Amino acid sequence: MNKKIFYTVTSLIGITIIYFTVKKFFGKKAQPIGSVLFVGDSITAIESSGKPVTSTYPNIIKSELSPKGVKVDVVAQGGKRTDWILTNLKEKLKTNKYDRVYIYAGINDMFSSVSIESALQNIQKMVDLIKSKGAEPYVIIGYDAKTFMDENKLKPTSYVPTKAGMVKLKNRYIEFQNAIPNAIKGATIVGKFNIPSSMTGDAIHPTPSGQKIIAESLLKDLRMSI
């Protein structure tokens, strides 16, 4: 009889320990997001040549989250590569603290002489910096360049004077995008956005409708975290 009581009590203690252990590790409610920073290039920028750009995804997100008390900042400029973004992210984080930082970068690197490895290394440095400041790093792969970048819309430039040269750079960007999930450590990877090629005029920049798709994709997660 005593032995039965002993086993019953022992079982109850064991169940209680398991319950509180599970509750401790899985029952915690995540801290709400109170501040977000977006860093990137022209796809992310909220101004161009000193003039505001209202159609890009950070502004769409800001218009929804700011009234809810969430601080939304942006460090982005057209034509900039990952080295510039890394430098300016460092400066921003010296005087500002964020709960979450989104990185959307690399296309200007891939359409220049910067290697895939160097661009990925810069993004990893951003991730490590963000984590050291107590924020959550998110790396955005971006639209699916394979389908979004309509080769008929890719225009040669003074630096890349042929269509074949532009297609080669497009393929380099696809390779860079595909490398992100395995190359970048310690960050949440945001998968490719399904934006049709009809939502771009130059095969690089999404139209306002395309920007809305990006914003809505990110807001789905953000809404659950505020």
Residue ranges and their predicted role:
Residues N2-F26:
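Single-pass alpha-helical membrane anchors
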Residues I46, A76-Q77, R81, I107-E117, ...:
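Surface-exposed cleft-lining segments at the edges of enzyme active sites
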Residues V22-A76, K90-K97, P181:
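Serine-esterase "nucleophile elbow" of acetyl-processing enzymes
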Residues F38, D83-L120, Y138, Y143-T147:
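Oxyanion-hole/transition-state-stabilizing segment in secreted/luminal serine hydrolases
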Residues V74-A76, I141-G142, G191:
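Residue-level recognition of beta-strand->loop/alpha-helix junctions
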Residues T147-K192:
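Substrate-gating cap/lid alpha-helix
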Residues S132-P137:
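A short helix->loop->beta-strand "cap" motif at the edges of active sites that frequently abuts
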Residues E64-L65, I85, R100, I180, ...:
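Histidine-centered active-site loop/cap adjacent to the catalytic His
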